[in-house]
């Protein structure tokens, strides 16, 4: 797989990636840095633009989408990216989404023309994945089942773009990489690249602290019924568990004190990053800012200080 753009690709596809690293202000007496990779500045508003572009590119190059719709399960962001990038390339998209996905995410899917299949909210993305598999099994000639949780193009997206960008932007000074984990593609691809460049780098995965949580898109890997096939548990040096309450509080703090409006999963990742610099005053921590808090404005009660 190759991340380089092809001549046939829509101009919108070429706008994905090369997002900035934004500093989070810390105590000036410390030498540590926390740098937020602003993935919400991708054209579709999330890190999943990289994943969707890579999967679409791979499928188109292999002829998988000739006369077929792209089908996948998503908590919202990958589905939005498929729909947006698919619209630019003339690819029709069907997305299975848990019914508790935020109204903003569901609205964006419809605006971009995706067919949306809502699944049981209590079953989360596991249930959405099961429904997508069922749909594909019933009409395999109509759909290409992308299956982002097992598609190698997911990892390739980050190995070929996110990782090299971070390495270049930090001039190799990065000491810790932090990413929230759902499909785990961001950690596997970016972390794998960075580990090859700098074997002593610390890779920190972030997951909810409970199977019942409010962090859309993330998995509690120990209890999920469908562990991502992409996940290599030997790659992260540690996995930090963050509660929904701490993630929410951190996202609110970022909005009010830095102007960075990020979603709940990014709040969880930043909380884990801040824990690192409390213990390691010389660390250079890069954390993935997965998406924008604008995707969750309907959860206004979570944004209000309690």
What are the functions of these language-model segments?
Residues 1-306:
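PLP-dependent amino-acid enzyme catalytic core
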């Amino acid at each position: 797989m190759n991340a380089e753009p092809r001549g046939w690709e829509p101009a919108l596809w070429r706008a994905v990636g090369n997002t900035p690293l934004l500093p989070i202000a810390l105590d000036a007496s410390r030498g540590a840095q926390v740098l937020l990779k602003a993935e919400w500045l991708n054209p579709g508003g999330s890190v999943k633009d990289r994943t969707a572009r890579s999967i679409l590119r791979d499928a188109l190059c292999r002829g998988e989408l000739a006369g077929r719709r792209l089908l996948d399960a998503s908590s919202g962001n990958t589905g939005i990216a498929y729909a947006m990038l698919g619209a630019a390339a003339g690819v029709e998209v069907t997305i299975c989404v848990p019914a508790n996905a935020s109204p903003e995410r569901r609205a964006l899917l419809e605006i971009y023309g995706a067919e949306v299949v809502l699944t049981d909210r209590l079953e989360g993305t596991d249930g959405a994945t099961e429904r997508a598999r069922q749909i594909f099994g019933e009409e395999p000639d109509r759909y290409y089942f992308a299956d982002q949780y097992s598609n190698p193009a997911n990892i390739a997206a980050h190995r070929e773009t996110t990782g090299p960008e971070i390495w270049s932007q930090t001039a190799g000074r990065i000491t810790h990489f932090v990413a929230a984990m759902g499909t785990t593609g961001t950690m596997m691809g970016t972390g794998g690249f960075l580990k090859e460049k700098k074997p002593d780098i610390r890779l920190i995965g972030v997951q909810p602290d409970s199977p019942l949580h409010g962090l859309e898109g993330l998995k509690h890997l120990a209890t999920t019924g469908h562990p991502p096939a992409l996940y290599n548990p030997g790659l992260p040096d540690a996995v930090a568990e963050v509660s929904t309450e701490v993630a929410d509080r951190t996202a609110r703090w970022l909005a009010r004190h830095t102007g960075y409006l990020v979603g709940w999963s990014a709040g969880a990742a930043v909380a884990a990053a801040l824990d690192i610099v409390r213990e390691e005053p010389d660390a250079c921590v890069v954390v993935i800012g997965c998406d924008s808090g604008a995707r969750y404005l309907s959860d206004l009660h979570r944004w209000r200080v309690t």
